[in-house]
Structure formats: C-alpha cells, structure tokens
Amino acid sequence: MNNAGKNMYEKLTIRDKFMFGKVTKNPVIAQKMADLLTPVEMGEVKGVEREKFLQHRNSSKYVKLDMYLEDENGRVVDTEMQNKSQNRVVQEELPLRVRYYQGMIDQEILSSGTDYIFLKETYIIFICTYDPFEIMLCIYDA
C-alpha cells in the first residue's frame, strides 16, 4: 500500500461506516466492544452480522442493524453508529426507534408458538457522535 492509501486509513475513526464495518467484523474486537458498552461481561461470540436486515412483512418498515452480535449465553447486542451529519435523529424519535428495533429483534428470535420465556437478553446501543437529548450526558439508558 502506498503512503497516500496508508494515510487515508490512518485518518479514519470508528464513526466512519467503512471503519466501523471493518472493526465490528472481527469477533474478538466486537466482543470487547460489547463488553465495554453493556453492563454485563459477554460470553464467547457465536456470531457477528453486519448490516443484518430484518423485515417481517412486505408492508412493514424494515431495519438494517449495523452490528448484530450473539454470545454463547444467548445474549444479543445490536450496536448502531449514529452520525448527526448522515442522519439527523430528533429527540422524540430515538427512543421510538430503539423500541421498534427491540420488537423486530424479538420477532426474529421468537418463533410462532414459542413461550415468551425464550426471549433473549438483548441490548440495543446507539453510539451517537452528538448529544441526542442535549442534556450533556455521556450515557443515556432505559
């Protein structure tokens, strides 16, 4: 790789879609990231999917999950990179978006006729490059 190409990669941060994809594609790095972002220590990663597409009916809104990770204990982590310049999310919309993603993930996990006890422990994380609620906190959780 020439110096120009090397310098281009050195300037990228995890907020860049390309770099986020490269980093989260690696199960070891994805697990460390999940350990840092969740209140639990993740087990060994069983699988990582980038840009996982979920749509349960043709007429329903689909979601494309940036990084979908499942560990050996059945925990699921969806990590989304949210750049203000790429996609403005209003304060009222972000919690509703999380709710919708949770519902879509739950539908993916639970087959028809399966008891609700089999829903998995799930974490949905939005890494925002801005303060989405403008009250000067680094972490918001529900």
What do these predicted ranges mean?
Residues M1-A142:
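Elongated, amphipathic alpha-helical interaction scaffolds
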